[in-house]
Design a protein with these regions (language model features):
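Positively charged, low-complexity/disordered segments
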Residues: 2-6
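PEST-like low-complexity, intrinsically disordered acidic/proline/serine-rich tracts
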Residues: 7-8, 12-222
Length: 222
């Protein structure tokens, strides 16, 4: 899926029967306003919208900058969106499957000039990655393999492959360039200014009191 254009259309046909069912069920929860715990993670300022923090790292409408910090034992991928920091442990083993951190469990190694990062053990609430630009579903045992390859002084080629036999009938892949913007990251102070979620829930309670049905979420806009 070069450039990730129309990515949802490209992977829609790759869902298994079980995968499509779970995807539809997860998308249906977006029409529930019973409380904050059931609302999307981006609305709750827990992780960024969609898959902006990765893996795979996919662009959204804004705050797409990523700062890469490297030490002898770790690589940190800091996304400007919600300040998601993914720590990649170099030349280590994965944790036990029962350990499911936000953004998954990432381990990496170098293959010639490419940094290869393999991530699995995803956190259950992150099964549905949904934004205006992309949307897909993955199980906790989904495996994402990423490759970061410098192609110029100011560019890294980012490539990834998603494998999840329970959800997809075959693997799917994509790539996009990561260009050096020369800009600094700004603080994404989500909780401090999050008036949207209280407003969403207050609107739902008013609709309940008035006996009004919620307008269904347009899947093309979520």
């Amino acid at each position: 899926i070069p450039g990730l254009v129309g990515s949802e259309m490209c992977i829609r046909d790759r869902y298994s029967v079980v995968g499509r069912q779970k995807y539809d069920e997860a998308l249906g929860f977006r029409n529930s306003y019973e409380g904050p715990e059931i609302r999307p993670l981006g609305e709750r300022c827990i992780v960024g919208f969609g898959s902006s923090g990765g893996p795979p790292k996919l662009p959204v409408l804004y705050n797409n900058l990523t700062q890469i910090v490297q030490t002898k034992d770790y690589v940190i991928l800091l996304a400007e969106m919600n300040h998601d920091a993914r720590i990649v442990r170099l030349n280590q083993d994965h944790y036990q499957p029962s350990f499911n951190p936000w953004l998954g469990d990432s381990v990496g190694y170098y293959e010639e000039d490419s940094l290869v990062v393999v991530t699995t053990n995803f956190h259950v609430p992150q099964n549905l990655r949904s934004s205006l630009d992309h949307r897909f579903y993955g199980s906790t045992s989904m495996t994402v393999t990423e490759r970061f390859t410098r192609t110029a002084n100011d560019q890294i080629l980012y490539q990834f492959t998603v494998e999840d036999p329970e959800i997809y009938s075959q693997a799917w892949s994509g790539e996009l360039p990561m260009n050096n913007s020369g800009e600094q990251l700004f603080e994404y102070a989500c909780h401090e200014g999050n008036y949207a979620l209280p407003g969403i829930l207050a609107g739902a309670r008013r609709a309940d009191a008035d006996g009004v049905e919620y307008a269904p979420t347009d899947p093309g806009r979520q």
